Amino acid sequence: MPTTKKTLMFLSSFFTSLGSFIVICSILGTQAWITSTIAVRDSASNGSIFITYGLFRGESSEELSHGLAEPKKKFAVLEILNNSSQKTLHSVTILFLVLSLITSLLSSGFTFYNSISNPYQTFLGPTGVYTWNGLGASFVFVTMILFVANTQSNQLSEELFQMLYPATTSKGTTHSYGYSFWLILLVILLNIVTVTIIIFYQKARYQRKQEQRKPMEYAPRDGILF
C-alpha cells in the first residue's frame, strides 16, 4: 500500500488532471473561441457583420447603419466550409484537441492508480504521468497555434463570411479571441502543476532514501558486523 503522503500527492495530481479534462470538454463544447468583426460597405448596406464561432458551431449577426439587416444565422462550421485548406486545418485543430483530451483522461487514470498502488518502476508510475502530461500540453499548444494560423493567415473567418453572405463584400476584418480560446492556457497550466506535484514527490522520496542510508554508512564496523 502507498504511504499517506504519496496518496495525498497523487490524489492532488489526479484532481489537476481531472480539471484539465473538464476544461478541455468545456473548450470543445463552447463556441466563444473567436469573434470576427467584418466591415461591409456597398450601395445597399453599410455597417458590420459579427461572426462568433468555436470548433463546431457558431452564429453571425449584422449591425447596419443603413440597409435591411438579416436575422441572426446559426451554422455548423465544418458543414458550411467547402473542401478547402481552411476546412482541413480546422479538422486537424479538432483532432489535436481531442488527442489532448485523451491524454488528460489517461493522466487522470494513472495518477489515481498511483494513489492506491505502487507501480513505481513501470510506465504506470511517474514516467507515465510525465509522458501523458507532456503530450497533452504539446497537443493543446499545437491546437492553439493551428487555430490562430487558420484565422489570421488562412482567413477562416473570411471564408465563413463568404459562405454566409455571398452577395456582400468585405472591407476589412478584425478578430477578438474569446474565453474558450484562452482556456487553453489553463489546460497547459494544469498539466504543469500535475507534473510539478509528482516531481516534488519524487524529490522527497529520494531524500528520504538518502537519509535512511546515512545511518548504515556511518555506523561503527563492529555494530554492522553484529
UniProtKB/Swiss-Prot annotation:
Its main location: membrane. The keyword Cell wall biogenesis/degradation does not apply. Glycans are attached at N83. Keywords: Glycoprotein, Membrane, Transmembrane, Transmembrane helix. GO terms for biological process: sensory perception of sound. InterPro entries: Clarin (IPR026748). It is a multi-pass membrane protein. One of its GO terms (cellular component) is extracellular exosome. The keyword Repeat does not apply. Signal peptide: none annotated. The chain crosses the membrane at residues 8-28, 92-112, 129-149, 181-201. It is found in: Membrane. PANTHER family: CLARIN, CLARIN-3. Belongs to the clarin family. This is Clarin-3. It comes from Homo sapiens.
